[in-house]
Amino acid sequence: MSVIKKPDLTDPKLRAKLAKGMGHNYYGEPAWPNDLLYVFPVCILGTFACCIGLAVMAPTQMGEPADPFNTPLEILPEWYFFPTFNLLRVLPNKLLGVLAMARVPAGLITVPFIENVNKFQNPFRRPIASLVFILGFFTAVWLGIGACLPIDKAVSLGFW
């Protein structure tokens, strides 16, 4: 707050302008032209310069170049699809896999009804919701790691 110039409300000129509904820009730093004409274009041009400079000076590849004559043995999806990919891959029936994936939002919808007497926002005071979140998180991580392994180790992760 020390940077902003505070109005002097004992000034009779300012009090007269404020009484008429004017004088709101009598104090402080005006947005025009200081911010809109000078600061904003500098920030925008600086952002463009950083993006273009990084693109020219340090280009990155998106992975291995595509080879139309050599198809990989197993095509993996993006990392955020690993749990559902592994679930569909491990379950023998595809309908069972789709129903298992539909069970996730259905389970999340039922949590507030199970815990409807508890109105707290603190997660430590909502044990059922916290338990559902923790179990779901660890299950998703487990299935995600298993998606990168061969199908015989996809569920056990090679531990047993």
Curated annotation (Swiss-Prot):
<feature type="transmembrane region" description="Helical">
    <location>
        <begin position="95"/>
        <end position="115"/>
    </location>
</feature>
<protein>
    <recommendedName>
        <fullName>Cytochrome b6-f complex subunit 4</fullName>
    </recommendedName>
</protein>
<keyword id="KW-1133">Transmembrane helix</keyword>
<comment type="function">
    <text>Component of the cytochrome b6-f complex, which mediates electron transfer between photosystem II (PSII) and photosystem I (PSI), cyclic electron flow around PSI, and state transitions.</text>
</comment>
<keyword id="KW-0472">Membrane</keyword>
<dbReference type="GO" id="GO:0005739">
    <property type="term" value="C:mitochondrion"/>
</dbReference>
<keyword id="KW-0602">Photosynthesis</keyword>
<dbReference type="GO" id="GO:0008121">
    <property type="term" value="F:ubiquinol-cytochrome-c reductase activity"/>
</dbReference>
<dbReference type="GO" id="GO:0045158">
    <property type="term" value="F:electron transporter, transferring electrons within cytochrome b6/f complex of photosystem II activity"/>
</dbReference>
<dbReference type="GO" id="GO:0045156">
    <property type="term" value="F:electron transporter, transferring electrons within the cyclic electron transport pathway of photosynthesis activity"/>
</dbReference>
<comment type="similarity">
    <text>Belongs to the cytochrome b family. PetD subfamily.</text>
</comment>
<keyword id="KW-0249">Electron transport</keyword>
<dbReference type="GO" id="GO:0009535">
    <property type="term" value="C:chloroplast thylakoid membrane"/>
</dbReference>
<comment type="subunit">
    <text>The 4 large subunits of the cytochrome b6-f complex are cytochrome b6, subunit IV (17 kDa polypeptide, petD), cytochrome f and the Rieske protein, while the 4 small subunits are petG, petL, petM and petN. The complex functions as a dimer.</text>
</comment>
<dbReference type="InterPro" id="IPR005798">
    <property type="entry name" value="Cyt_b/b6_C"/>
</dbReference>
<keyword id="KW-0812">Transmembrane</keyword>
<feature type="transmembrane region" description="Helical">
    <location>
        <begin position="131"/>
        <end position="151"/>
    </location>
</feature>
<keyword id="KW-0150">Chloroplast</keyword>
<dbReference type="InterPro" id="IPR005870">
    <property type="entry name" value="Cyt_b6/f_cplx_suIV"/>
</dbReference>
<keyword id="KW-0793">Thylakoid</keyword>
<dbReference type="InterPro" id="IPR048260">
    <property type="entry name" value="Cytochrome_b_C_euk/bac"/>
</dbReference>
<keyword id="KW-0813">Transport</keyword>
<dbReference type="GO" id="GO:0006122">
    <property type="term" value="P:mitochondrial electron transport, ubiquinol to cytochrome c"/>
</dbReference>
<dbReference type="GO" id="GO:0009767">
    <property type="term" value="P:photosynthetic electron transport chain"/>
</dbReference>
<feature type="transmembrane region" description="Helical">
    <location>
        <begin position="36"/>
        <end position="56"/>
    </location>
</feature>
<dbReference type="Pfam" id="PF00032">
    <property type="entry name" value="Cytochrom_B_C"/>
</dbReference>
<keyword id="KW-0934">Plastid</keyword>
<dbReference type="InterPro" id="IPR036150">
    <property type="entry name" value="Cyt_b/b6_C_sf"/>
</dbReference>
